[in-house]
Curated annotation (Swiss-Prot):
Name of the protein: S-adenosylmethionine synthase
Protein's organism: Laribacter hongkongensis (strain HLHK9)
Region (Flexible loop): 99-109
Gene, per the UniProt record: metK
Source organism phylogeny: Bacteria, Pseudomonadati, Pseudomonadota, Betaproteobacteria, Neisseriales
Function: Catalyzes the formation of S-adenosylmethionine (AdoMet) from methionine and ATP. The overall synthetic reaction is composed of two sequential steps, AdoMet formation and the subsequent tripolyphosphate hydrolysis which occurs prior to release of AdoMet from the enzyme.
Binding site for K(+): E43
Subcellular location as annotated: Cytoplasm
Amino acid sequence: MSEYLFTSESVSEGHPDKVADQISDAILDAILTQDKHARVAAETLVNTGLVVLAGEITTHANVDYIHVARETIKRIGYNTSDLGFDAKGCAVLVGYDKQSPDIAQGVNEGQGIDLNQGAGDQGLMFGYACDETPTLMPFPIYYAHRLVQRQAELRKDGRLPWLRPDAKSQITCAYDSETGLPKRIDTVVLSTQHSPDISHDMLTEAVIEDIVKPVLPAHMLTAETKFLINPTGRFVIGGPMGDCGLTGRKIIVDTYGGAAPHGGGAFSGKDPSKVDRSAAYAGRYVAKNIVAAGLARQCQIQVSYAIGIAEPTSISVDTFGTNAIPNEKIVELVKRHFDLRPKGIIQMLDLLRPIYTKTAAYGHFGREEPEFTWEATDKAAALRADAGL
């Protein structure tokens, strides 16, 4: 049988871009704890010994931004100067402005041309789900996330004390060309920062035996599966000392690993009035419920918005030939069962809560945590009944 390959990557919480994402979302959560209607667009830059906080924030909350940044860095594991970046010693610069009043009047209810709560910007967002894994996520990104989660677990509990916070993973999966389903794992790449006193051979054996094999399904590993562990041979310098990190630079890691398109808007540091974030979460919720309902084995939804306008400017669905009913019918069901106006999304998914720091590493989707309301399949039964299936 013919097959094709598809690859997705993930990065650990200690990757510099993810450090920035987590600081941005920790600041968002600290603000939402005091002021759930705050407007937040918190951007972060991290580099050797330096954190820069900038963006637009309008709130009555009183937050010690420097303390939040340091505590986030400490939790991730950068707590010694040996790593070139540590929570106590780094400089933190703060430069937040307020949200533009021109934008605010389009988002605030009762202001602007559309008196409903309008979208915070124009843009397009995608949601996706498929039946490749129990959480209805694509196989490669799901397991790429699990690998770096396992790396962090073994680092933090001391079982592999030579591990350091920065790490990356990559899964190449072979798919059956006829069924479109995962067939075998072709290649596993895992690069992890480490202390200088561990040999490459010892590191490779420990990573394969203690990180890779406990995570990946044994039946998907074959004699031909390639394991590429720290393929440069050395990864001592890492984190913000090795690379500058920025909020919003891992948007494919955050979503579907390239298995679905991305509208381009990042998530972290943005309050839910920003449809870049909230509508992408709603898109995942819609797509996952469509697949869970058996309306399709694979579903991609696109929604788009105009700044200041509540109703989406478009809703479209693609099921890649796996649909049980016509796509046009699915779009009708989406409009009946899901309120995709910004305020409707916020209420539907209960988004005015300090839940976002947890989303900022290991993927925003495919994690069935209690806070991740967009992962629920509570609409599936109603969709299936309304579809007549």
